């Protein structure tokens, strides 16, 4: 049963720590009973006081004046006021005090009633009255004819009209006081009973609602065994009152202020975060192309104004390489062609193709978002660079490959437009830090003549990552021309650069040949490590030995290359792996690349006609190098599996090789 608003307005919140201030949630009848009893006591007290004072003023006898119970009337009035307060504030302490005063008033009322009744009987018996001056002296009837008894026992009443009327008025007043005191005693008794029942009910409620107090006592759970309350107590107390719980605090979604990730994201999208803007993890950022507006010559670097070239005209034929995250590593999953108006997702690889590979722009959103390195993605569509255009025409290649983002599937035949180099600049490092360019080793016929398109089965091209750079064979010198400023070619994946066999060697011929063979191969665990490599600047580029090659079930020695000393010193981090501890898997990959199962030929030319060719007809005197470095975190699951497969290669377990047009080949790291 729910309490009414008036009941709740009369009750205060209880304080468990203060037992005396605990209020009783009583029903309206019980509260009205307390109010009625208090008012009755106040009224009876006032009447007793009034009649007692009038009676004492009528008579001049000292015994009657002292027996008038005016003191009982004062106690009744005070007890009644406490009762009214207990109705207004039903605290346990107030109710207990009211019950105590009620018991005291009962005793005082009984004493006052006895005294008042005795004096009333005396006034009724003294019928023999005589006038002495202005006072009527009344004496009890005595059969003997003599005057009143001894002095002091007579009743003296103030003269009114007659002595009988004065005596009768005194008698009536005393009987009235006697009756009032008796009624006051009854009212005080009821008040004391009601208060005791309320206090007892409060104790019973405490025992029922807090049974754990008895369990924690010295006698254990047998200290108190309470029974269900009686129906009377249920009707008296509201035990089912609903107390609404405290409402929970308002919920606000977490706000992520500017951090390292948001800094990198602002760098990526060429935006500035002046104030901490709330970023929620469920909100996907816009696509790179939608923000940057990659159209024609706007695809140059974001932070290097030197790379902006007005002659860069790139027609947009987008090809998207979907990238999936495998425990922090980037794994190329699928390749598809989209129309010119399509926009790739944030983790896609954008290839700009028109007839030939003109521009490549690969957005590594995950890596850029998690690093604070100030690298940028740029695109150089100019035809000038390490690779010159060849007069040999070719047909436009079709954008598809298995591991890399910029690999044509089939070799371009004659009659097609020339291919320009693909530029993917991540950071413009100083020219004195030698970049590491990978190289391509081809087997050239001993006759020295080179054909326009070497047969794939007879001369399978191989790719690997040479951290020291490609060595220029003796006798091959670049033509005398003014070398342009070094244009570094960091790449999005582990597709190595291709070098020509001579000054007039055609790079595109070799490059498209390798891409044809790579398109026919299947990604395996031994080549997965190279397929996720990305190009960054390193302070050191150690020169690993060239891996062996096997073709037509024959093993051939691989020449050893000389190491090129590079400037040493601490290098800032350029990827997530560097930030996580200077890339702990770098040492494992370097050790694996430096291992060789057979000693290479120190002369640089093997028994089967391998020849090392130069990368570019110009550049720095000496050698140019392009270092391949993994974009993904090698501590992830897929990278660990690739390291384990690399361990198996190191212990002699060679992977299967695929044949293309009758030729057997193996992809080496």
Curated annotation (Swiss-Prot):
The UniProt keywords, alphabetically, are:
Glycoprotein, Membrane, Phosphoprotein, Transmembrane, Transmembrane helix
Q: Which organism is it from?
A: Mus musculus
GO MF: WW domain binding
Classify the protein's membrane topology as the record does. Multi-pass membrane protein
Q: Which family does it belong to?
A: Belongs to the ENTREP family.
Glycosylated residues (UniProt): 160
* Predominant cellular place of this UniProt entry's protein: membrane
Identify residues that carry Phosphoserine: 359, 390, 494, 575
What is its subcellular localisation? Membrane
Q: Where is this region: Disordered?
A: 387-420, 445-502, 550-571, 597-624
The yes or no answer to whether the keyword Glycosyltransferase is present is no
Q: Name one Pfam family in it.
A: CD20
* Quaternary structure and partners: May interact with WWOX.
Protein name, per record: Protein ENTREP3
Compositional bias segments (type: Low complexity): 399-408
For this record, an example GO cellular component is: membrane
Residue ranges annotated as transmembrane are 34-54, 67-87, 91-111, 174-194
């Amino acid at each position: 049963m729910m309490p009414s608003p008036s009941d709740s307005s009369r009750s205060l919140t209880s304080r468990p720590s203060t037992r005396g201030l605990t209020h009783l949630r009583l029903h309206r009848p019980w509260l009205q009973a307390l109010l009625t009893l208090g008012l009755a006591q106040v009224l009876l007290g006032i009447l007793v006081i009034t009649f007692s004072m009038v009676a004492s003023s009528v008579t001049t006898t000292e015994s009657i004046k002292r027996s008038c119970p005016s003191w009982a009337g004062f106690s009744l009035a005070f007890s009644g006021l406490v009762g009214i307060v207990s109705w207004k504030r039903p605290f346990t302490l107030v109710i207990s005090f009211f019950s105590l005063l009620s018991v005291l008033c009962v005793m005082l009322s009984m004493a006052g009633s006895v005294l008042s009744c005795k004096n009333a009987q005396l006034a009724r018996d003294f019928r023999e009255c005589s006038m002495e001056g202005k006072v009527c002296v009344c004496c009890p009837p005595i059969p003997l004819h003599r005057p009143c008894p001894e002095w002091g026992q007579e009743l003296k009443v103030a003269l009114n009209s007659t002595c009988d009327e004065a005596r009768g008025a005194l008698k009536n007043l005393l009987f009235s006081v006697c009756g009032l005191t008796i009624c006051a005693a009854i009212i005080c008794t009821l008040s004391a009973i009601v208060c005791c029942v309320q206090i007892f009910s409060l104790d019973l409620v405490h025992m029922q609602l807090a049974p754990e107090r008895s369990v924690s006592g010295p006698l254990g759970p047998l200290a108190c065994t309470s029974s269900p309350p009686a129906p009377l107590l249920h009707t008296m107390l509201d035990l089912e009152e609903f107390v609404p719980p405290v409402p929970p605090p308002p919920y606000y979604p977490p706000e992520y202020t500017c951090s390292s990730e948001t800094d990198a994201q602002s760098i990526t999208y060429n935006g500035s975060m002046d104030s901490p803007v709330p970023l929620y993890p469920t909100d996907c950022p816009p696509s790179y192309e939608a923000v940057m507006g990659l159209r024609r010559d706007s695809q140059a670097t974001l932070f290097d104004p030197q790379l902006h070239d007005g002659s860069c005209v790139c027609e947009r034929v987008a090809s998207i390489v979907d990238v999936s995250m495998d425990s922090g590593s980037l794994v190329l999953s699928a390749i598809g062609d989209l129309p010119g108006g399509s926009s790739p997702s944030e983790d896609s690889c954008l290839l700009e193709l028109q007839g030939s590979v003109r521009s490549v722009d690969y957005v590594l959103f995950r890596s850029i978002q998690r690093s604070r390195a100030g690298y940028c993605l740029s695109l150089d569509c100019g035809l000038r660079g390490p690779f010159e255009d060849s007069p040999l025409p070719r047909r436009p290649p079709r954008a598809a490959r298995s591991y890399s983002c910029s690999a044509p599937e089939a070799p371009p035949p004659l009659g097609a437009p020339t291919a320009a180099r693909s530029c993917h600049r991540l950071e413009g490092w100083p020219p004195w830090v030698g970049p590491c360019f990978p190289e391509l080793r081809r087997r050239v016929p001993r006759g020295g003549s080179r054909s326009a398109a070497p047969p794939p089965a007879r001369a399978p091209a191989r790719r690997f990552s040479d951290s020291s750079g490609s060595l220029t064979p003796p006798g091959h010198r670049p033509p005398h021309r003014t070398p342009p400023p070094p244009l570094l070619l960091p790449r999005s994946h582990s597709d190595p650069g291709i070098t020509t066999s001579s000054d007039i060697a055609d790079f595109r011929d070799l490059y498209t040949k390798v891409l044809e063979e790579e398109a026919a191969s299947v990604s395996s665990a031994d080549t997965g490590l190279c397929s996720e490599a990305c190009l960054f600047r390193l302070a050191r580029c150690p020169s690993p030995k060239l891996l062996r090659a096997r073709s037509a079930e024959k093993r051939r020695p691989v020449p050893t290359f000389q190491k090129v000393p590079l400037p040493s010193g601490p290098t800032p981090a350029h990827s997530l792996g560097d930030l996580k501890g200077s890339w702990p898997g770098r040492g494992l990959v370097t050790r694996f690349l430096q291992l060789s199962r057979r000693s290479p030929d120190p002369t640089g030319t093997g028994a089967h006609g391998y020849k090392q060719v130069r990368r570019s007809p110009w550049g720095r005197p000496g050698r140019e190098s392009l270092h391949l470095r993994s974009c993904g975190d090698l501590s992830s699951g897929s990278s660990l599996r690739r390291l384990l497969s690399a361990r198996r290669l190191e212990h002699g377990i060679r992977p299967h090789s695929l044949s293309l047009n009758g030729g057997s080949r193996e992809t080496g790291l």
